[in-house]
Protein backbone atom coordinates (compact mmCIF):
# COMPACT_ATOMS: atom_id res chain seq x y z
CA UNK A 1 0.00 0.00 0.00
CA UNK A 2 2.59 2.56 1.11
CA UNK A 3 5.22 3.03 -1.58
CA UNK A 4 8.73 2.61 -0.16
CA UNK A 5 11.02 4.99 -2.01
CA UNK A 6 14.49 3.53 -2.51
CA UNK A 7 17.09 4.59 0.00
CA UNK A 8 19.95 6.72 -1.18
CA UNK A 9 23.39 5.08 -1.12
CA UNK A 10 24.53 8.02 0.98
CA UNK A 11 22.95 9.99 3.78
CA UNK A 12 19.75 11.73 2.58
CA UNK A 13 20.16 15.45 2.06
CA UNK A 14 18.01 18.09 3.73
CA UNK A 15 15.67 19.84 1.32
CA UNK A 16 14.61 23.45 1.82
CA UNK A 17 12.21 25.84 0.09
CA UNK A 18 13.66 29.11 -1.18
CA UNK A 19 10.84 30.38 -3.36
CA UNK A 20 7.06 30.11 -3.51
CA UNK A 21 4.48 31.38 -5.98
CA UNK A 22 0.71 31.08 -5.84
CA UNK A 23 -2.34 32.03 -7.91
CA UNK A 24 -5.88 31.36 -6.68
CA UNK A 25 -9.26 33.03 -6.89
CA UNK A 26 -8.12 35.16 -3.94
CA UNK A 27 -5.53 36.78 -6.21
CA UNK A 28 -2.06 36.41 -7.66
CA UNK A 29 0.91 36.36 -5.32
CA UNK A 30 1.92 35.39 -1.79
CA UNK A 31 0.74 38.53 0.01
CA UNK A 32 -2.82 38.76 -1.29
CA UNK A 33 -3.31 35.04 -0.73
CA UNK A 34 -1.78 35.10 2.75
CA UNK A 35 -4.15 37.90 3.76
CA UNK A 36 -7.12 36.09 2.23
CA UNK A 37 -6.43 32.72 3.82
CA UNK A 38 -5.62 34.26 7.20
CA UNK A 39 -8.93 36.13 7.19
CA UNK A 40 -10.88 33.13 5.88
CA UNK A 41 -12.16 34.96 2.81
CA UNK A 42 -14.28 33.05 0.31
CA UNK A 43 -13.66 33.63 -3.39
CA UNK A 44 -16.76 32.00 -4.92
CA UNK A 45 -18.95 33.68 -7.53
CA UNK A 46 -21.22 32.84 -10.48
CA UNK A 47 -19.33 31.12 -13.29
CA UNK A 48 -18.49 33.40 -16.24
CA UNK A 49 -15.88 31.36 -18.11
CA UNK A 50 -18.43 29.10 -19.81
CA UNK A 51 -22.15 28.45 -20.04
CA UNK A 52 -23.63 26.76 -16.96
CA UNK A 53 -27.28 27.39 -17.79
CA UNK A 54 -27.92 23.65 -18.10
CA UNK A 55 -26.04 22.78 -14.92
CA UNK A 56 -27.50 22.30 -11.47
CA UNK A 57 -24.65 24.29 -9.91
CA UNK A 58 -23.73 27.83 -11.00
CA UNK A 59 -20.76 28.86 -8.82
CA UNK A 60 -17.01 28.30 -8.72
CA UNK A 61 -13.81 30.05 -7.64
CA UNK A 62 -12.56 31.76 -10.80
CA UNK A 63 -9.17 33.45 -11.08
CA UNK A 64 -8.97 37.03 -12.37
CA UNK A 65 -5.91 36.96 -14.62
CA UNK A 66 -3.90 40.17 -15.05
CA UNK A 67 -3.92 41.92 -18.41
CA UNK A 68 -0.21 41.21 -18.87
CA UNK A 69 2.07 38.38 -17.81
CA UNK A 70 5.51 38.98 -16.30
CA UNK A 71 8.39 39.13 -18.82
CA UNK A 72 9.69 35.78 -20.08
CA UNK A 73 11.70 34.43 -23.00
CA UNK A 74 8.51 33.58 -24.91
CA UNK A 75 7.77 35.62 -28.05
CA UNK A 76 4.69 37.84 -27.92
CA UNK A 77 2.86 35.76 -30.52
CA UNK A 78 3.24 32.61 -28.42
CA UNK A 79 2.23 34.41 -25.23
CA UNK A 80 -0.98 35.52 -26.93
CA UNK A 81 -1.85 31.88 -27.63
CA UNK A 82 -1.21 30.52 -24.15
CA UNK A 83 -4.09 28.72 -22.48
CA UNK A 84 -5.53 29.84 -19.16
CA UNK A 85 -3.75 27.23 -17.04
CA UNK A 86 -0.35 28.08 -18.52
CA UNK A 87 -0.84 31.76 -17.71
CA UNK A 88 -1.54 30.93 -14.07
CA UNK A 89 1.42 28.58 -14.02
CA UNK A 90 3.77 31.22 -15.42
CA UNK A 91 2.60 33.77 -12.85
CA UNK A 92 3.27 31.36 -9.98
CA UNK A 93 6.59 30.19 -11.43
CA UNK A 94 7.80 33.75 -11.97
CA UNK A 95 7.03 34.66 -8.36
CA UNK A 96 8.79 31.58 -6.99
CA UNK A 97 11.77 32.01 -9.31
CA UNK A 98 12.17 35.69 -8.42
CA UNK A 99 11.93 35.01 -4.70
CA UNK A 100 14.45 32.18 -4.84
CA UNK A 101 17.19 34.29 -6.38
CA UNK A 102 18.05 31.48 -8.79
CA UNK A 103 20.15 32.47 -11.77
CA UNK A 104 19.52 31.19 -15.29
CA UNK A 105 20.62 27.57 -15.58
CA UNK A 106 19.62 25.18 -18.33
CA UNK A 107 19.85 22.05 -16.21
CA UNK A 108 16.98 22.45 -13.73
CA UNK A 109 14.42 19.62 -13.48
CA UNK A 110 10.74 20.55 -13.62
CA UNK A 111 8.14 18.38 -11.87
CA UNK A 112 4.50 19.43 -12.22
CA UNK A 113 1.17 17.96 -11.18
CA UNK A 114 -2.01 18.46 -13.17
CA UNK A 115 -5.13 16.54 -14.16
CA UNK A 116 -4.23 15.71 -17.75
CA UNK A 117 -2.84 19.03 -19.01
CA UNK A 118 -5.11 21.04 -16.74
CA UNK A 119 -8.08 19.38 -18.50
CA UNK A 120 -8.54 22.46 -20.65
CA UNK A 121 -6.11 21.19 -23.30
CA UNK A 122 -8.27 18.16 -24.00
CA UNK A 123 -11.44 20.23 -23.99
CA UNK A 124 -9.93 22.74 -26.44
CA UNK A 125 -8.76 19.96 -28.75
CA UNK A 126 -12.12 18.23 -28.87
CA UNK A 127 -14.09 21.46 -29.21
CA UNK A 128 -12.11 22.67 -32.21
CA UNK A 129 -12.00 19.22 -33.79
CA UNK A 130 -15.79 19.01 -33.68
CA UNK A 131 -16.31 22.55 -34.98
CA UNK A 132 -13.89 22.29 -37.89
CA UNK A 133 -13.05 18.61 -38.45
CA UNK A 134 -11.89 19.14 -42.05
CA UNK A 135 -9.35 21.83 -41.28
CA UNK A 136 -6.08 20.01 -41.91
CA UNK A 137 -4.09 23.21 -41.50
CA UNK A 138 -4.99 23.38 -37.82
CA UNK A 139 -4.72 19.67 -37.09
CA UNK A 140 -0.97 19.67 -36.40
CA UNK A 141 -1.31 22.54 -33.93
CA UNK A 142 -4.17 20.77 -32.19
CA UNK A 143 -2.20 17.57 -31.77
CA UNK A 144 0.90 19.39 -30.50
CA UNK A 145 -1.17 21.30 -27.95
CA UNK A 146 -3.11 18.21 -26.83
CA UNK A 147 -0.36 16.89 -24.53
CA UNK A 148 -0.39 16.76 -20.72
CA UNK A 149 3.16 18.16 -20.65
CA UNK A 150 2.37 21.10 -22.95
CA UNK A 151 2.27 23.59 -20.09
CA UNK A 152 5.51 22.25 -18.64
CA UNK A 153 7.20 22.83 -22.00
CA UNK A 154 5.92 26.40 -22.00
CA UNK A 155 7.47 26.99 -18.57
CA UNK A 156 10.82 25.59 -19.71
CA UNK A 157 10.83 27.83 -22.77
CA UNK A 158 9.70 30.84 -20.73
CA UNK A 159 12.61 30.55 -18.28
CA UNK A 160 15.18 29.14 -20.67
CA UNK A 161 16.06 25.85 -19.06
CA UNK A 162 16.06 22.37 -20.50
CA UNK A 163 16.28 20.02 -17.55
CA UNK A 164 14.20 16.85 -17.45
CA UNK A 165 10.42 17.29 -17.32
CA UNK A 166 8.08 15.11 -15.27
CA UNK A 167 4.33 15.60 -15.44
CA UNK A 168 2.21 13.75 -12.87
CA UNK A 169 -1.50 13.30 -13.51
CA UNK A 170 -2.76 11.45 -10.45
CA UNK A 171 -6.16 13.01 -9.84
CA UNK A 172 -6.39 15.41 -6.91
CA UNK A 173 -3.12 14.20 -5.38
CA UNK A 174 -1.14 15.34 -8.45
CA UNK A 175 0.28 18.55 -6.98
CA UNK A 176 1.39 16.87 -3.76
CA UNK A 177 2.83 13.92 -5.69
CA UNK A 178 4.82 16.33 -7.86
CA UNK A 179 6.30 18.11 -4.84
CA UNK A 180 7.01 14.78 -3.18
CA UNK A 181 8.76 13.44 -6.27
CA UNK A 182 10.82 16.62 -6.56
CA UNK A 183 11.73 16.33 -2.87
CA UNK A 184 12.92 12.76 -3.45
CA UNK A 185 15.09 13.86 -6.38
CA UNK A 186 16.88 16.42 -4.25
CA UNK A 187 16.94 14.36 -1.06
CA UNK A 188 18.59 11.38 -2.72
CA UNK A 189 21.17 13.33 -4.67
CA UNK A 190 19.63 13.12 -8.13
CA UNK A 191 19.30 16.90 -8.37
CA UNK A 192 20.57 19.93 -6.47
CA UNK A 193 17.45 21.99 -7.14
CA UNK A 194 14.04 21.43 -8.70
CA UNK A 195 11.15 23.67 -9.75
CA UNK A 196 7.91 21.96 -8.76
CA UNK A 197 4.20 22.46 -8.10
CA UNK A 198 0.76 22.01 -9.62
CA UNK A 199 -1.79 23.75 -11.81
CA UNK A 200 -5.32 23.38 -13.15
CA UNK A 201 -7.93 25.59 -14.75
CA UNK A 202 -11.70 25.48 -14.75
CA UNK A 203 -13.27 24.02 -17.86
CA UNK A 204 -16.79 23.15 -18.90
CA UNK A 205 -16.16 19.43 -19.40
CA UNK A 206 -14.96 18.85 -15.85
CA UNK A 207 -17.52 21.18 -14.32
CA UNK A 208 -20.36 19.34 -16.05
CA UNK A 209 -18.80 16.00 -15.14
CA UNK A 210 -18.62 16.73 -11.43
CA UNK A 211 -22.13 18.17 -11.56
CA UNK A 212 -23.45 15.00 -13.19
CA UNK A 213 -21.86 12.98 -10.38
CA UNK A 214 -23.88 15.10 -7.92
CA UNK A 215 -20.53 15.96 -6.33
CA UNK A 216 -20.88 19.76 -6.55
CA UNK A 217 -22.60 21.92 -3.98
CA UNK A 218 -24.99 24.65 -5.16
CA UNK A 219 -23.65 26.84 -2.35
CA UNK A 220 -20.07 27.41 -1.11
CA UNK A 221 -18.56 24.17 0.17
CA UNK A 222 -18.42 23.44 3.92
CA UNK A 223 -15.71 20.85 4.63
CA UNK A 224 -16.34 18.66 7.69
CA UNK A 225 -19.78 20.15 8.27
CA UNK A 226 -22.40 17.60 9.29
CA UNK A 227 -24.73 18.98 6.59
CA UNK A 228 -22.14 19.36 3.80
CA UNK A 229 -23.54 18.92 0.29
CA UNK A 230 -20.47 18.60 -1.92
CA UNK A 231 -17.42 20.39 -3.23
CA UNK A 232 -17.00 23.69 -5.06
CA UNK A 233 -14.56 23.79 -7.96
CA UNK A 234 -11.75 26.29 -8.23
CA UNK A 235 -8.61 26.86 -10.27
CA UNK A 236 -5.08 28.00 -9.67
CA UNK A 237 -1.38 27.24 -9.66
CA UNK A 238 1.38 27.05 -7.07
CA UNK A 239 5.12 26.58 -7.45
CA UNK A 240 7.99 25.89 -5.05
CA UNK A 241 11.73 26.07 -5.61
CA UNK A 242 13.41 23.20 -3.77
CA UNK A 243 17.13 22.82 -3.21
CA UNK A 244 19.59 21.22 -0.87
CA UNK A 245 20.24 23.00 2.40
CA UNK A 246 23.94 23.10 1.57
CA UNK A 247 23.33 24.77 -1.81
CA UNK A 248 20.94 27.34 -0.32
CA UNK A 249 23.36 28.26 2.47
CA UNK A 250 26.34 28.48 0.13
CA UNK A 251 24.63 31.11 -1.98
CA UNK A 252 23.16 32.97 1.00
CA UNK A 253 19.53 32.29 0.07
CA UNK A 254 16.58 33.17 2.27
CA UNK A 255 15.11 29.85 3.42
CA UNK A 256 11.33 29.82 3.73
CA UNK A 257 10.88 26.36 5.20
CA UNK A 258 11.94 22.73 5.03
CA UNK A 259 10.19 19.63 3.71
CA UNK A 260 11.01 16.80 6.09
CA UNK A 261 8.64 14.02 5.05
CA UNK A 262 6.52 12.68 2.22
CA UNK A 263 4.61 9.49 1.58
CA UNK A 264 2.22 8.20 -1.08
CA UNK A 265 -0.24 5.31 -1.00
CA UNK A 266 -3.21 3.88 -2.87
CA UNK A 267 -6.14 2.01 -1.34
CA UNK A 268 -7.62 0.65 -4.63
CA UNK A 269 -11.09 0.58 -3.12
CA UNK A 270 -13.39 2.39 -5.56
CA UNK A 271 -13.12 4.70 -8.57
CA UNK A 272 -14.54 7.73 -6.73
CA UNK A 273 -15.02 6.71 -3.08
CA UNK A 274 -12.16 6.37 -0.58
CA UNK A 275 -11.82 3.33 1.64
CA UNK A 276 -14.23 3.84 4.59
CA UNK A 277 -11.48 3.11 7.13
CA UNK A 278 -9.10 5.56 5.47
CA UNK A 279 -6.36 2.96 5.23
CA UNK A 280 -4.26 4.67 2.56
CA UNK A 281 -4.71 8.10 4.13
CA UNK A 282 -3.63 6.67 7.48
CA UNK A 283 -0.63 5.06 5.78
CA UNK A 284 0.55 8.29 4.14
CA UNK A 285 0.28 10.34 7.32
CA UNK A 286 2.03 7.63 9.33
CA UNK A 287 4.68 7.06 6.67
CA UNK A 288 5.43 10.73 6.07
CA UNK A 289 5.83 11.38 9.80
CA UNK A 290 8.05 8.34 10.20
CA UNK A 291 10.35 9.59 7.44
CA UNK A 292 10.31 13.04 9.04
CA UNK A 293 11.26 11.51 12.38
CA UNK A 294 8.31 13.01 14.24
CA UNK A 295 5.17 11.85 16.03
CA UNK A 296 1.64 13.32 15.84
CA UNK A 297 2.34 15.03 19.18
CA UNK A 298 4.87 17.25 17.38
CA UNK A 299 2.45 18.37 14.66
CA UNK A 300 0.96 21.83 15.18
CA UNK A 301 -1.54 21.93 12.31
CA UNK A 302 -3.07 19.68 9.65
CA UNK A 303 -4.10 21.18 6.32
CA UNK A 304 -6.77 18.65 5.43
CA UNK A 305 -7.77 17.56 1.95
CA UNK A 306 -11.34 18.33 3.06
CA UNK A 307 -13.38 18.46 -0.15
CA UNK A 308 -16.78 18.70 1.61
CA UNK A 309 -18.09 15.57 -0.09
CA UNK A 310 -19.80 13.16 2.34
CA UNK A 311 -17.44 10.22 1.78
CA UNK A 312 -14.13 12.09 1.57
CA UNK A 313 -14.51 14.08 4.77
CA UNK A 314 -15.77 11.12 6.79
CA UNK A 315 -12.89 8.97 5.61
CA UNK A 316 -10.28 11.65 6.23
CA UNK A 317 -11.73 12.22 9.71
CA UNK A 318 -11.39 8.52 10.50
CA UNK A 319 -7.81 8.50 9.20
CA UNK A 320 -6.79 11.59 11.19
CA UNK A 321 -8.39 10.16 14.33
CA UNK A 322 -6.48 6.88 13.89
CA UNK A 323 -3.18 8.57 13.10
CA UNK A 324 -3.25 11.33 15.74
CA UNK A 325 -4.26 9.12 18.68
CA UNK A 326 -4.43 11.01 21.95
CA UNK A 327 -3.24 14.20 20.22
CA UNK A 328 -6.39 14.41 18.10
CA UNK A 329 -8.56 16.28 20.61
CA UNK A 330 -6.29 19.34 20.54
CA UNK A 331 -4.89 19.13 16.99
CA UNK A 332 -5.98 22.12 14.84
CA UNK A 333 -7.31 21.11 11.42
CA UNK A 334 -8.87 23.06 8.55
CA UNK A 335 -9.50 22.81 4.82
CA UNK A 336 -8.57 25.85 2.76
CA UNK A 337 -10.87 24.61 0.00
CA UNK A 338 -13.55 26.48 1.94
CA UNK A 339 -11.86 29.65 0.63
CA UNK A 340 -10.74 28.84 -2.94
CA UNK A 341 -12.56 25.63 -3.79
CA UNK A 342 -11.08 22.40 -5.07
CA UNK A 343 -8.34 23.25 -7.55
CA UNK A 344 -7.93 19.58 -8.52
CA UNK A 345 -4.37 18.93 -9.76
CA UNK A 346 -3.22 22.21 -8.24
CA UNK A 347 -4.72 21.51 -4.81
CA UNK A 348 -1.74 19.75 -3.23
CA UNK A 349 0.63 22.49 -4.38
CA UNK A 350 -1.68 25.35 -3.37
CA UNK A 351 -2.11 23.81 0.06
CA UNK A 352 1.63 23.25 0.41
CA UNK A 353 2.16 26.97 -0.12
CA UNK A 354 -0.60 27.77 2.40
CA UNK A 355 1.11 25.41 4.86
CA UNK A 356 4.35 27.27 4.24
CA UNK A 357 2.54 30.54 4.98
CA UNK A 358 1.45 29.23 8.37
CA UNK A 359 5.05 28.31 9.18
CA UNK A 360 6.47 31.63 8.00
CA UNK A 361 3.83 33.93 9.47
CA UNK A 362 2.63 31.94 12.52
CA UNK A 363 -1.12 31.77 12.00
CA UNK A 364 -3.71 29.10 11.25
CA UNK A 365 -6.08 29.46 8.27
CA UNK A 366 -9.71 29.48 9.42
CA UNK A 367 -12.42 27.56 7.62
CA UNK A 368 -15.40 29.80 6.81
CA UNK A 369 -18.94 28.48 6.50
CA UNK A 370 -18.77 25.64 9.01
CA UNK A 371 -22.01 25.45 11.01
CA UNK A 372 -22.19 22.04 12.71
CA UNK A 373 -19.06 19.92 12.99
CA UNK A 374 -19.41 16.35 11.77
CA UNK A 375 -19.39 14.13 14.89
CA UNK A 376 -16.89 11.84 13.13
CA UNK A 377 -14.27 14.54 13.65
CA UNK A 378 -12.37 13.97 16.86
CA UNK A 379 -10.33 17.12 16.18
CA UNK A 380 -11.15 20.84 16.40
CA UNK A 381 -11.62 22.82 13.19
CA UNK A 382 -10.03 26.26 13.01
CA UNK A 383 -13.03 28.57 12.58
CA UNK A 384 -11.62 32.07 13.05
CA UNK A 385 -8.43 34.00 12.54
CA UNK A 386 -5.89 32.41 14.88
CA UNK A 387 -2.31 33.32 15.70
CA UNK A 388 -0.30 30.30 16.80
CA UNK A 389 3.16 28.86 17.29
CA UNK A 390 3.48 26.66 14.20
CA UNK A 391 6.61 24.53 13.86
CA UNK A 392 5.44 21.43 11.97
CA UNK A 393 2.58 21.12 9.49
CA UNK A 394 1.04 18.08 7.80
CA UNK A 395 -0.68 18.63 4.44
CA UNK A 396 -2.97 15.93 3.00
CA UNK A 397 -4.00 15.39 -0.63
CA UNK A 398 -6.32 12.57 -1.63
CA UNK A 399 -7.77 11.78 -5.05
CA UNK A 400 -10.17 9.62 -7.01
CA UNK A 401 -9.12 6.01 -7.33
CA UNK A 402 -7.56 6.03 -3.87
CA UNK A 403 -4.52 8.19 -4.70
CA UNK A 404 -3.20 9.58 -1.41
CA UNK A 405 -0.24 11.76 -0.48
CA UNK A 406 1.00 13.56 2.62
CA UNK A 407 3.71 16.20 2.93
CA UNK A 408 5.33 17.23 6.22
CA UNK A 409 6.92 20.67 6.47
CA UNK A 410 8.93 22.33 9.23
CA UNK A 411 9.50 25.94 10.13
CA UNK A 412 12.94 27.32 9.35
CA UNK A 413 14.41 29.09 12.36
Predicted regions and their residues:
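Active-site nucleophile and cofactor-binding loops and adjacent substrate-binding regions
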Residues: 51-52, 81-86, 140-148, 166-174, ...
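Active-site-proximal alpha-helical scaffold in enzymes
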Residues: 89-99, 148-151, 156-159, 164-197, ...
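Conserved beta-ketoacyl condensing-enzyme motif
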Residues: 17, 41-170, 199-207, 296-312
Amino acid sequence: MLFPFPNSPSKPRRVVITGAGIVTALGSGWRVNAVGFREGRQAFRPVTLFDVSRQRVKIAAEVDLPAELPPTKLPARRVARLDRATKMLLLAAHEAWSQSGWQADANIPLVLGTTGGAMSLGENYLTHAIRSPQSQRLQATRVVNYQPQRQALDVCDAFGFSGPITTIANACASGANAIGHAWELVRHGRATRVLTGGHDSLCQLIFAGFDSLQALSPSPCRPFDAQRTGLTLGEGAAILTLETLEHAQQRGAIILGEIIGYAAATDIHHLTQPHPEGNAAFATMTGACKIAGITPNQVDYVNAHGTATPHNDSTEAVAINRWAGTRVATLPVSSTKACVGHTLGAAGAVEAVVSLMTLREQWLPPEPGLVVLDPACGFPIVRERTDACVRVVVSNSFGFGGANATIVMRRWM
